[in-house]
């Protein structure tokens, strides 16, 4: 599962219902199997567990402070009781290293604005947070991990977006080497 973007939203009845329905889908499975069986009857022979997932990936907005990320992840680990992964951004590398890799080493002509580094967590803030969350997960009998290639804020250089949109968010394969 993937949830976000802030603790208030994650604690909302709608998101809590979604999490509960994925953790225990026994009431919804018969109708879902019937629907899929119309296109693929073999689905009836597949053993589908009622618990579809006990794992959550936390997405937060760019600029979310490390303390808030940690608060949300602790809530998911301790109160909801799910294995939790936190998405972090390549800006953890810092401006010189990230731009050097992206532009010089890999040859991408992409401009990463200074602002992208100003509002995302810094490596020196993220590392202690990750260590504390790993300990929280161990104490709760859960797993904790990070995804280091979430998205990267870059200057809008493509005609796909309106000119008034000054930034766009890069994702996918280009970020894998940065990870």
Task: Label each region the model flagged.
Residues 25-31, 35-44, 82:
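Long, charged, helix-rich clamp/arm modules that form nucleic acid-engaging surfaces
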Residues 28, 48, 72-82, 125-144:
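A structural motif corresponding to the C-terminal end of an alpha-helix
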Residues 40-56, 101-109, 113:
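N-terminal small/glycine-rich loop or linker at the start of catalytic domains
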Residues 54-67, 118, 122:
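Active-site mouth loops of central-metabolism enzymes
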Residues 67-68, 178:
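Residue-level recognition of alpha-helix initiation/capping sites
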Residues 68-95, 99-105:
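The feature marks a conserved, polyanion-engaging helical scaffold used by nucleic-acid processing enzymes
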Residues 90, 94-179:
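Glycine/Thr-rich beta-alpha phosphate-binding loop at enzyme active sites
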């Amino acid at each position: 599962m993937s949830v976000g973007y802030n603790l208030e939203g994650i604690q909302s009845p709608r998101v809590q219902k979604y999490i509960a329905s994925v953790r225990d889908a026994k009431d919804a499975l018969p109708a879902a199997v019937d629907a899929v069986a119309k296109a693929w009857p073999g689905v009836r022979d597949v053993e589908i567990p009622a618990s579809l997932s006990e794992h959550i990936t936390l997405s937060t907005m760019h600029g979310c402070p490390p303390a808030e990320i940690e608060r949300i992840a602790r809530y998911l680990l301790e109160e909801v009781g799910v294995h939790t992964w936190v998405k972090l951004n390549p800006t953890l590398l810092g401006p010189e290293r990230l731009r050097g890799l992206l532009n010089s080493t890999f040859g991408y002509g992409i401009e990463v604005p200074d602002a992208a580094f100003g509002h995302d967590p810094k490596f020196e803030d993220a590392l202690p947070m990750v260590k504390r969350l790993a300990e929280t997960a161990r104490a709760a009998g859960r797993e904790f991990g990070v995804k280091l290639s979430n998205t990267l804020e870059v200057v809008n250089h493509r005609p796909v977006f309106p000119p008034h949109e000054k930034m766009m968010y890069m994702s996918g394969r280009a970020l894998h080497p940065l990870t």
